[in-house]
Amino acid sequence: MELKETGADAGKDGLLIPVDSEVVRAWQVEQCPHRAEIQGIALIPSSSDDGFFLGSVDAYGRFIVTSLNSDIPGSSYTAGPRDAGVGEGWWAGIVFNRNVPSLAAVGRGFAKAVDVYDKDMHVRTLRTLQHPTCLTFLQGPLFDSGTILAVTEGPQLSIWDLRQAERGGCVQRMLGAFTGDSLNAIACSSEGLVAVGGAERVVMVMDPLKWTPRSRWTGCLKYEVTGLSFSAVDPGLIYVHGLDYEVVCAPWNREKTGGSNTPAFSFRGDSRWLGFDKCCDSDLFAGWSEAGTIYAGHVDGNADL
């Protein structure tokens, strides 16, 4: 993988040394009145114009969706859970449905619940067995309806169909971490494959036809996995980042690489990641480090970074 002339220099052992860069475009959120610590954010394009909607959720599960379009400034709508749960704030996450942008799912850790909303209208609540840690709507040929939600809860991966009433909507449940450690991340490929990872530093890729493990990549990082994303340029590659400052892009299927998970490329930031994410339809990624540095990169079809 070739590192082209961008806003960073290569240092020792894959460390990227940041340099000053000019911000081409930025949005300012005029109003985002959360009353508790923000736990998660999500971004989705607007279906009616070229703008974006930013969703943020606080530790109590109350979320705000804000329009980033200059023509429609300010907060769009806000909603919160119908029940107060245990009255304690903890992890919370929000994810939008790419097929139906108005549909959002909000996970609440202490409450062991996932609330589904259509804009600011509460649709239903899914009750998990353990504390949820990550959630996403599944995409791909097998999930054209856009109503299938995947949730990591403890060491388990649970699959939910929003159209089903039996068993509370849960259609499948499987063990994603054989050691019993918590799962922290989940990703879905364009082919419908589902990957999970967490504290045991293993990336497990599931076959959605039988919900059985298709591949296991052990010891992928030095510390526990906190984020996953399949490559849009090459579906055989997966991005993995962890609790420290490391990012690895490597093949997930060892059968096609002779039993090796040799990285296509990897790099380290200047300090621990506070946030890191990748676009769903391209290999454009960005991370924010504890030192206040923002890293951004793009891998094109020629395998140039």
Task: Specify the residue positions occupied by each region the protein language model found.
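Per-blade loop-tip surfaces of WD-repeat and WD-like beta-propellers in eukaryotic adaptors/scaffolds
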Residues: 3-9, 14-23, 60-81, 106-134, ...
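Blade-loop segments of beta-propeller domains
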Residues: 5-51, 88
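Canonical WD40 repeat/beta-propeller blade segments in eukaryotic WD-repeat proteins
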Residues: 33-46, 83-97, 128-142, 172-188, ...
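Short coil/turn segments that connect the beta-strands within blades of beta-propeller domains
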Residues: 50-52, 99-102, 144-147, 191-192, ...
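Structural core positions within WD40/WD-like beta-propeller blades
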Residues: 55, 104-105, 148-150, 195, ...
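Ankyrin-repeat and related helical/solenoid repeat scaffolds used for protein-protein interactions
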Residues: 229-286
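Blade-level signature of beta-propeller repeat domains, shared across WD40, Kelch, NHL, RCC1
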Residues: 275-305
